[in-house]
From Swiss-Prot:
GO terms for biological process: chromosome condensation; sperm DNA condensation. Keywords: Chromosome, Developmental protein, Differentiation, DNA condensation, DNA-binding, Nucleosome core, Nucleus, Spermatogenesis. This is Sperm protamine P1. Testis. The keyword DNA-binding applies. One of its GO terms (cellular component) is nucleus. It comes from the Eukaryota. Disulfide bonds: none annotated. GO terms for molecular function: DNA binding.
Length: 50
């Protein structure tokens, strides 16, 4: 398991993994990227299904 930083300078696919750590580190960035995390997770699921 890799450790990601609240998807700050990482790709959207890597930002969908951390969610609890994101809350711990940088709350502003996490809150602003929270939507991106949800989008990322939904896209990753659709990509795996198709």
């Amino acid at each position: 398991m890799a450790r990601y930083r609240c998807c700050r300078s990482q790709s959207r696919s890597r930002c969908c993994r951390p969610r609890r750590r994101c809350r711990r580190r940088r709350r502003r960035s996490c809150r602003a990227r929270r939507r991106a995390t949800r989008c990322c997770r939904r896209r990753y699921r659709l990509s795996r299904r198709y």
